[in-house]
Amino acid sequence: MVYPKKVYFKDYVFMVDEHVYEPAEDSFLLAEKMTVTEDEAVLDMGTGCGIIAVLAAEKAKSVVAVDINPYAIECAIKNAEMNGAREKIEFRHGDLVKPIKPNEHFNLILFNAPYLPSEPDEEKSWVGKAWAGGSNGRKVIDRFVMDAPNFLAVGGRIQLVQSSLSDVNRTIQMFNERNLRAMVATQVKVAFERIVLVEVKR
C-alpha cells in the first residue's frame, strides 16, 4: 500500500492512503476533546487512518477500532504499529456495530460520523463513505444512535461528531428517547457549517 500523505498531531505521525479519509477539523476536534481515562474499554467507530484509536490507546485499557473500509483497517494497523499502540488495539472490518459481539460493552464510544448531506454517487467511493451521510446527512447517524447504546456500559459515554447541517437537535432527541443524557459539548465554525461534538451519558 502506498501512503501519499502524512498527518501530524502532537507527537504523532499518521500515514494516509488515497482511499482513506484524511483527518481534518472534525477529527482534530474529537482528538482534542475525547475523555479517555485509565482502565476503560473504548470503541472507535469509523476509525479511518486510526488517529482516534491510537490517541485513545494512550490511556485506555483496550480499544476496538471498526471500519467498513478495508483500506482504512490496513492503514490504521500500520499507524498503530508505527506509533507504538498496536498491542492495545483490536481492529475489526465491518459495518458499524456488526463486528461487535452482543455481550461486549464499552465505557466510551467515539464516532466521527459521515454527516454531510450527499448525493448517492458521492457515497460510492471509500473516501466518500467516510463523509457522505445521505440526502439529509443522517443516514449513518440514525443507525448509530439506535444501535450504539446497546453496547454502552453502565456509566458509559458516547462522543459523536456531526455537522450543524445534519440536525443536531434530532440526534439529541433520539439519544434522550433511549433514556440517555445528550448535549452539545462544543462546536467549531468552519466554512459553511458548524462541526458539533455531542456528548452522551448513561
Give the ranges of each region predicted by the language model.
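Class I SAM-dependent transferase core
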Residues: 2-36
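Conserved beta-strand segments that form the floor/walls of ligand-binding pockets within enzyme
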Residues: 15, 67, 130
